A protein has these predicted regions:
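Membrane-proximal extracellular "stem/stalk" segments
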Residues: 236, 240-324
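Glycine-centered flexibility motif
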Residues: 12-18, 35, 146, 171, ...
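Juxtamembrane interface at the cytosolic side of transmembrane helices
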Residues: 2-10, 24-27, 316-350
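Solvent-exposed N-terminal domain segments of exported/luminal and surface proteins
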Residues: 2-130
Length: 350
């Protein structure tokens, strides 16, 4: 009597099911960890922005570099820099601001790892301001989102505000054939005095000549406001005013949800002198004489293409593993069906 194929069909079905479940899970789980060898350079389109001396052209260069953590494979070191360059027509470009940061990220969540100090340094030529900052536990996302990004809000760290502010999911679209999520963050008229106080709390090195009074302007309203603004705000030219600086930003981030890679970044930044937050929010008239920095910075197309290429191999791998999972589970069902038929036929012959 021939040996029944039933046991082999059952074993094959179990193996197919395991292959369809375990292999994709292991491969995808390994692939979504934040890589420890990322080198990414982002550049914004040259943009016309308002500054205290008038309109100028500016671009921002941003680098992200990850490297292995020597103590724990579950962590990765992130080093990032931001450089703002003025590009005066007919003159060499010059760096007007620089920021660098070094922190330890969790490779699974992309958040700063608790208990690991971060270091920042920045210099702003226009304000004659510079500082080095050692934070305890920095909170919020920075250069990456978590893999398997969800349609929800996340805390996102703003290096100027020096705090994590929610960034909200706003919708999805497609970029280069990839499904992407869009997030938006709004920081509203934050007084620079508050930023300075927050910075001073962790500062290890400050410019000793810089004081809170340097973030304030005093004088006649006519020295700071155009005639149109004077009428709009109900001020007279000889009215004495005290202006503080306020920081606002509308930030739109486009993310590949499979890998957490940021694919596009748009930042509408407003740093202005104003009597109060309400006046700082009023952008109905361009603040031609009150602008520290007012402009929209958006990644250029080359940067967007490079970000897509950074994410695409993992996206393809996930699609391939989805197919492996479907085939494995389908084969398991087919083999179990064959085993069932074999069992019924065998029982009918008994």
């Amino acid at each position: 009597m021939a040996r029944s194929p039933l046991p082999w069909l059952v074993i094959a079905a179990i193996l197919a099911l395991l292959a369809g479940v375990l292999v994709p899970s292991l491969v995808v789980g390994r692939s979504i960890r934040l890589a420890d060898d990322v080198e990414f350079h982002a550049v914004t389109e040259p943009a016309a922005v308002l500054v205290e001396t008038g309109t100028t052209t500016v671009r921002m260069d941003n680098t992200y570099t990850t490297s292995p953590n020597e103590e724990d494979d579950a962590l990765v070191q992130l080093d990032t820099t931001k450089d703002f360059y003025r590009m005066p027509e007919g003159q060499p470009e010059n760096r007007s601001a620089h920021l660098s940061a070094s922190l330890t990220l969790n490779r699974e969540s992309a958040y700063p790892e608790a208990g690991h100090a971060s270091h920042q340094s920045f210099a702003v030529r226009q304000l004659n301001l510079g500082a080095s900052i050692d934070n305890g536990d920095m909170e919020g996302l920075t250069a990456f989102f978590p893999a398997d990004t969800e349609q929800r809000s996340y805390p996102y760290f703003d290096f100027i505000a020096q705090e994590a502010v929610p960034i909200d999911y706003t919708g999805k679209s497609k970029r280069g054939g990839i499904d992407v999520y869009e997030f938006h963050q709004h920081i509203d008229a934050l007084p620079a005095q508050d930023i300075l106080a927050r910075t001073a709390e962790y500062a290890t090195e400050n410019d000793p000549t810089f004081t809170p009074e340097d973030l304030r302007r005093r004088g006649r309203a006519g020295d700071f406001y155009t005639n149109e603004e004077l009428a709009h705000f109900g001020l007279k030219k000889d009215t004495a005013v005290v202006l503080d600086s306020f920081y606002s930003v509308d930030r739109t981030v486009t993310v590949d949800p499979a890998t957490g890679t940021i694919l596009d970044l748009d930042e509408n930044i407003s740093f202005v002198w104003a009597t109060d937050a309400k006046q700082a929010r009023d952008t109905s008239i361009p603040p031609e004489r009150r602008a520290v920095f007012v402009g929209d910075l958006h990644w250029d197309q080359t940067t967007q293409d490079a970000a897509l290429e950074l994410a695409r191999p993992t996206v393809r791998l996930h699609k391939a593993m989805g197919l492996v999972s479907w085939v494995g589970k389908g084969l398991a069902v087919a083999l179990l069906a064959a085993a069932g038929l074999t069992y019924l036929r065998r029982r009918d012959h008994v």
